[in-house]
Amino acid sequence: MANRNLEKLASIDAHLRLLVPGKVSEDDKLIEYDALLLDKFLDILQDLHGEDLKETVQECYELSAEYEGKRDPKKLEELGSVLTSLDPGDSIVIAKAFSHMLNLANLAEEVQIAYRRRIKLKKGDFADEAHATTESDMEETLKKLVYKLNKSPEEVFDALKNQTVDLVLTAHPTQSVRRSLLQKHGRIRNCLAQLYAKDITPDDKQELDEALHREIQAAFRTDEIRRTQPTPQDEMRAGMSYFHETIWKGVPKFLRRVDTALKNIGINERVPYNAPLIQFSSWMGGDRDGNPRVTPEVTRDVCLLARMMAANMYFSQIEDLMFEMSMWRCTDELRVRAEELFRTARRDVKHYIEFWKQVPPTEPYRVILGDVRDKLYNTRERARHLLAHDISDIPEEAVYTNVEQFLEPLELCYRSLCACGDRVIADGSLLDFLRQVSTFGLSLVKLDIRQESDRHTDVLDAITQHLEIGSYREWSEEKRQEWLLAELSGKRPLFGSDLPKTEEIKDVLDTFNVLAELPSDCFGAYIISMATSPSDVLAVELLQRECHVKQPLRVVPLFEKLADLEAAPAAMARLFSIDWYKNRINGKQEVMIGYSDSGKDAGRFSAAWQLYKAQEELKNVAKEFGVKLVMFHGRGGTVGRGGGPTHLAILSQPPDTIQGSLRVTVQGEVIEQSFGEEHLCFRTLQRFCAATLEHGMNPPISPRPEWRELMDQMAVVATEQYRSIVFKEPRFVEYFRLATPELEYGRMNIGSRPSKRKPSGGIESLRAIPWIFAWTQTRFHLPVWLGFGAAFKQAIQKDSKNLQMLQEMYKTWPFFRVTIDLVEMVFAKGDPGIAALNDKLLVSEDLWPFGESLRANYEETKDYLLKIAGHKDLLEGDPYLKQRLKLRDSYITTLNVCQAYTLKRTRDPNYHVTLRPHISKEYAEPSKPADELIHLNPTSEYAPGLEDTLILTMKGIAAGMQNTG
């Protein structure tokens, strides 16, 4: 198969070169990388499980490839009969093999992207394949602003050092790959990149070959399935591991590159170390919306754990800095401090490895940094004690309690070096360290708290009932506001210890008590989901005051559903009209807009347009009241939940809605894609910072009035069609549950939170992630495209000139272009033939016409999209992506078919299959089948092996689509 596979891959490559000769360069290594990994893997498979199993994998691959060529449904049935005849152990091995091959294809692709980028930069070209604007590189962006758009270098520098990008890592349950495997994947990537380095010796090559073999085999031999559900603390540790592995060192490295880019446009200053260019926040252990497992104790643990990790990372670096700071020339200010510290230093020196004796005053910088090291040690140990025992005997004065205390001695060293003519030394590791302290502080990340507005209403209702002044829940909005403002303006406490509390009320109040107990720099924003009115915001302000939160968190309303987005500007105007609130916010307000629930509620088309309009209107309201507005974008990883390339998403936002301040969620599997490797981390930071700068200094065009009018009309049609099918069609939920693996999603143990807000109920109560996940698995992607076709059809039928208008919008308006391109990309990943197979096997016959009409709608929508984009074929403007998707099609199809038939076997007790004798030989005992794999899941309610096979197909398809939910 390896040779045949290489031929097939090469033919895809040749076909692409013919299509667009200028676009696919001859130095493209993707085919080579992919074939090498596949070769290695197939050899391993044969060694471990025998020739017969390897041949079955090849047979499945070839049937898939034949299907991909002609889309002949008979080939899927042939493939199905091969897969259903396998015994349970073989079935697991084959599903695992295809899932593994898709992960290897992803790794080949990542190494190729990094390789191509290096080649481009060496040539001095723009870094991206098609055109510069799709990849925001810092240096390119600065040069473009200065040389093409005639901005002055000083103006650009000024904008840059005042901008902030805050990346908020969330534990959304979409990372379907286990951490054990992610680490092995990282090592495979490194081996592959080094194997193709120019100056590699034969011995190096042999050793790397062995290492690659070892890591591929180790990954294949690791159980891909999480056998228990992760806790919020597990999720937080997984999220924080990226800081340890890439982000910690990535930030100073990125800021150095910004310094270099500034030098190249004539600015001879560095970005100040305290410029808030990049910030990190987290929802892991703070997001309790619909997740009962995030308790106040979890929030406290997560904050202390992050503080301990931060102190530990600083501590592990401080000795290197002490080695570097061996200079003796210093300012009088620093010398006096060093002598004072030397005199008063306690003699009970810690058991340090380096500088374990007292440092002499002739090395003043080391004396100062030695004191910093002692305090960091104590800071780490105190956090550890509090985490383990709730109490610590290390006094507060021996630790750093705020970041200013930590920065002060470091700034003293920096000033002294500069004053003594050693700026070049100051701008080395010390500057990097200062930048890390400014970025990560003592808490590593700022934890956001998220809670549903109803939970606050419950607490206030309990309080008003206890005070015997009525039921807060039943009061009108006016009465609620009046009472809240009266209490906020007064001084008296609202309730005492005698307040009767249910578990839920105690949970909410205890969360506020944790906010009061821990240092304020642990926390970021308090986000209220399902916020609709000013009283929702005032309620949180009052509860913070009542629970004695010394530095109250900024309160951020989250608008998600279509109706809430429409009402958001009016709600914010009412809030800004309240004098007490206007004084409280000091001219700054953050508003969060949710992409996933708005898409689930109204479909992607209407959600995208409403999000665009809501931002424009919110910006105008804020301007009217003299408030600086920060938009917080709650984007998922998939297009159905607002995902897509970062730089394009930023550059297509309405003009003046970012203005140098951007907050955005980085969710689930996107964290790995953004920060899994050093070069990915670097690229992510570049993209966000460069695109934010460009959006502010070179805003996209505003849509013309006639475009707006057309969009408004189309949005009505799109919403109507989407809702008429998803919410009004009486048997839609039944069809959805039969045609997709939605009901089986929970078995993957991806995240700590339940997949439903309420245990029973229809689409409304289903979370957006499993909703998208289920459709992604069947490659039908219904939530992404449903409504687009009807909207375009109606617009063009109403007036044929609208087609030209839509084509013009596509060419000149970034928002519209990005929206269409993302849906086109999803169509390129889709295959209605797979959805048809699922219908045939899993859906009751009387619902088949419903599936057929949806597939007809799919084809019609695709045709309209191509017409508007002016393309003959999907992705003709992006040959690289086309090539990458083609490479993985045959693997995914095998898993799709395996999933459909496995679902049939788990759901239909009357479906009988004839199993052939087992073909897999276990390496240690060739006579023994691979049935020990079945014993990894002893509690399955299905026939042996079926549940694991099913979960492996879900994980493999998620890896292949590169989108989970």
UniProtKB/Swiss-Prot annotation:
Chain positions recorded as L-aspartate binding sites: R641, Q673, K829, R888, N963
Keyword Phosphoprotein: yes
Enzyme Commission numbers on file: 4.1.1.31
Subcellular location(s) of the protein: Cytoplasm
Positions bearing Phosphoserine: S11
Regulation: Activated by the allosteric regulator glucose-6-phosphate. Inhibited by malate and aspartate. Up regulated by light-reversible phosphorylation.
Keyword Transferase: no
Record's keyword terms, sorted: Carbon dioxide fixation, Cytoplasm, Lyase, Magnesium, Phosphoprotein
MF annotations from Gene Ontology: phosphoenolpyruvate carboxylase activity
GO cellular component, one term: apoplast
Listed cofactors: Mg(2+)
Expression sites by tissue: Expressed in roots and stems and at low levels in leaves. Preferentially expressed in the phloem and in root tips.
List of catalytic residues: H172, K600, R641
Sites where the protein binds D-glucose 6-phosphate: W283, R450, D597, R635, T665, R753, R767, A768, I769
Transmembrane segments: none
Biological process annotations from GO: carbon fixation; leaf development; phloem sucrose loading; tricarboxylic acid cycle
Family matches, as PROSITE patterns: PEPCASE_1, PEPCASE_2
NCBIfam families tied to this protein: PRK00009.1
Family the UniProt entry places it in: Belongs to the PEPCase type 1 family.
Subunit structure: Homotetramer.
Described function: Through the carboxylation of phosphoenolpyruvate (PEP) it forms oxaloacetate, a four-carbon dicarboxylic acid source for the tricarboxylic acid cycle. May be involved in phloem loading with sucrose and in anions and cations uptake and amino acid biosynthesis in roots.
Protein name: Phosphoenolpyruvate carboxylase 1
Source organism: Flaveria trinervia
Gene that encodes the chain: PPCB
